[in-house]
From Swiss-Prot:
Modifications the protein undergoes after translation, according to the UniProt entry: One or more lysine residues are methylated.
Function, in words: Forms part of the ribosomal stalk which helps the ribosome interact with GTP-bound translation factors.
Subunit structure: Part of the ribosomal stalk of the 50S ribosomal subunit. Interacts with L10 and the large rRNA to form the base of the stalk. L10 forms an elongated spine to which L12 dimers bind in a sequential fashion forming a multimeric L10(L12)X complex.
The name this protein goes by in its record: Large ribosomal subunit protein uL11
Length: 142
């Protein structure tokens, strides 16, 4: 018989840097999960990723206080900022442009995000990422 699910906890945690301080500690402490056990498992799973990159994680907490977790790919906005070499997007994306990004870089990001996106094909996913780039004030070059 399958374990009874008590809760799903969604967090964004820096790769390789999970520790019991907020947001991890309070979110998991409320569910009665062993926080250090999660931190060690998460850090071990994300050690091959770039340290400090925010990684979305969905933690499934069971009634017996055990847990499983699934890591996702980093948010598109974070990958776009990294590719364009900027610190933050534009406050007025239609007026102030903050950087440029090539279509090849967009396709590379779409390939990275393909596992988490529900697009029909890579072209549709690339267009979705392109929309995110434009809303951040990035100019897309061919």
């Amino acid at each position: 018989m399958a374990k009874k699910v008590q809760a799903y906890v969604k967090l964004q945690v820096a790769a390789g840097m999970a520790n019991p301080s907020p947001p991890v500690g309070p979110a998991l402490g409320q569910q009665g999960v062993n926080i250090m056990e999660f931190c060690k498992a998460f850090n071990a799973k994300t050690e091959s990723m770039e340290k400090g990159l925010p990684i979305p994680v969905v933690i499934t907490v069971y009634a017996d206080r055990s847990f499983t977790f699934v890591t996702k790919t980093p948010p598109a906005a974070v990958l776009l900022k990294k590719a364009a070499g900027i610190k933050s997007g534009s406050g007025k994306p239609n007026k102030d442009k903050v950087g440029k990004i090539s279509r090849a870089q967009l396709q590379e990001i779409a390939q990275t995000k393909a596992a988490d996106m529900t697009g029909a094909d890579i072209e549709a996913m690339t267009r979705s990422i392109e929309g995110t780039a434009r809303s951040m004030g990035l100019v897309v070059e061919d």
